[in-house]
């Protein structure tokens, strides 16, 4: 068949259209933002700022964007994408990828692997969190799986929970998550 226009092409499918003799590609930066939220309420693993910073420092977000998401995403902080000129390029991430920093922060927060299972623990309990996502957008499971893998390298156990999109907002509003990822169009 013929294609006059296609939108929302998944990062993994872009290579299908790489033949410049067959396809004329015009692409712009999306106004879609992926939001990974942390539940910072007392009693939750992310209540301690050092744990939050450790998790963020354990994640190689630049590689996620370049490799997993085929350079179709930009790692960043604000809800405004780089295509909206509000100084995005001047922001500095204080929690860039740094496994040693992540391990040090966890140790400062009292988390150590005392039983040799590969996960840090405190008072006999592993540092464990559930990451809620939905699979309706191709990038969300990829990001969740990469987070699980990178977090394990510093001793944080991340359990992946794929939920129906229709219940995602309710889970977020009720605070029934440790980590939750979704996206919005800005």
Label each residue range with its predicted role.
Residues 29, 34, 56-90, 139-148, ...:
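Detector for C-terminal structural segments
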Residues 42, 46, 75-114, 135-142:
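Structural transition elements
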Residues 1-42, 54, 62, 66-67, ...:
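Extracellular/periplasmic solute-recognition and catalytic clefts
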Residues 9-12, 112-185:
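Ligand/substrate-recognition segments at binding pockets and active sites
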Residues 3, 22-23, 73, 111, ...:
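Short aromatic/hydrophobic-glycine micro-motifs
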